[in-house]
């Protein structure tokens, strides 16, 4: 069953901008809360939308048709990608339809983009409140703070990083190998490890009531959220090896090519310069990447400005094209180290994954798909 709700574009964009400003100020103060991930919770009965990233939260009034049929639900989107989309759209009401992906309609056009956390509900592509896992907060934060202490004093890893929790279907296990069982029978559909910012451990532990230690943990995409009563806090994940939310909805052929990082980076940089002449800094900057035998064609054309780059790559598969936001592509390549990068494409209706040659670092870029 599809879930549909409507929100004003201007109100939503202003809320996103304010959250980004809060996160950027916090980051400037060393709190490391860049809004890479937005957690969106919709209360079906109260017709309210809660948008949060880091410690910043905004509530927005929305309209949900047939609200009696819907419980509260939540889903995730990438922050900068979602913000760029909103800025590119004109004023007016935006209607969101959630299936395996999200369709955003503004009357004249429909924008389709992938949402995070869809693996539990393949039919509708969302998570509900039933996917919060109940844990003992007193034990959780005691373990996490002990790990921070070990990192700071023993120099096990960079002090800004805490390899905090291993996740399995039955329990959480901190890296001191002491098991911490879940209180409820909530289902965790994967095994893996997540990586948290150290500063979040200390700040979050002081937010919650130690005399009432039971709380809930929610992990979705690039964020881990904590909830106890009326207190909620979220932190972005600095890294993880599971769950693989990027491949929740794989569609189209999956192909991999290898390319020289500097060659693609310079081509993307030249395209950024051209794009700013025609589109301006505040607009969505769509670019197409086409793979053919041992070639990648990067093409940008808008409002009379255009550029085409042909890059040598290692690729012998079928021709394939994806449409992306140029700035996000440039940032992703710039953040990858090494001489050689691997690019995984799943077609126009999915995403691309860019990794370094040995697979230690990964960036994921959602697609742009406009249907008029």
What function would you assign to each model-found segment?
Residues 1-372:
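Structural preference for solvent-exposed beta-strand-turn elements
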């Amino acid at each position: 069953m599809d879930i549909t709700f409507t929100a004003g574009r201007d109100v939503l964009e202003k809320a996103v901008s304010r959250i980004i400003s809060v996160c950027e100020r916090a980051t400037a103060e060393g709190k490391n809360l860049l809004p890479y991930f937005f957690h969106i919770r919709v209360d079906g009965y109260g017709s309210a939308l809660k948008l949060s990233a880091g410690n910043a939260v905004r509530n927005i009034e929305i309209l949900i048709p047939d609200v009696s049929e819907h419980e509260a639900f939540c889903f995730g989107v990438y922050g900068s990608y979602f913000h760029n989309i909103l800025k590119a759209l004109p004023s007016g009401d935006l209607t969101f339809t959630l299936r395996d992906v999200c369709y955003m309609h503004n009357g004249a056009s429909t924008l389709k983009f992938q949402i995070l956390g869809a693996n539990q509900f393949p039919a509708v592509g969302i998570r509900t409140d039933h996917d919060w896992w109940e844990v003992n907060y007193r034990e959780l934060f005691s373990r996490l703070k002990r790990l921070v202490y070990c990192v700071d004093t023993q120099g096990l890893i960079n002090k800004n990083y805490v390899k905090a929790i291993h996740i399995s279907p039955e329990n959480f296990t901190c890296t001191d190998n002491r098991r911490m069982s879940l209180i409820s029978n909530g289902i965790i559909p994967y095994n893996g490890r997540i990586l948290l910012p150290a500063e979040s451990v200390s700040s979050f532990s002081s937010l919650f009531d130690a005399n009432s230690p039971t709380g809930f943990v929610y992990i979705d995409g690039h964020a881990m959220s904590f909830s106890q009563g009326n207190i909620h806090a979220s932190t972005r994940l600095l890294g993880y090896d599971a769950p693989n939310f990027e491949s929740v909805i794989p569609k189209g052929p999956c192909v991999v090519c290898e390319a020289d990082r500097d060659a693609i980076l310079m081509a993307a940089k030249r395209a950024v310069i051209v794009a700013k002449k025609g589109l301006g800094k505040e607009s969505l900057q769509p670019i197409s990447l086409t793979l053919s035998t041992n070639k990648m064609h990067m093409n940008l054309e808008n409002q009379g400005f255009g550029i085409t780059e042909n890059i040598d790559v290692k690729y012998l598969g079928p021709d394939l094209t994806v449409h992306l936001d140029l700035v996000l592509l440039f940032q992703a390549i710039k953040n990858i180290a090494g001489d050689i990068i691997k690019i995984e494409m799943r077609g126009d209706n999915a995403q691309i994954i860019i990794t370094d040659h040995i697979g230690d670092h990964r960036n994921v870029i959602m697609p742009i798909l406009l249907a008029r």
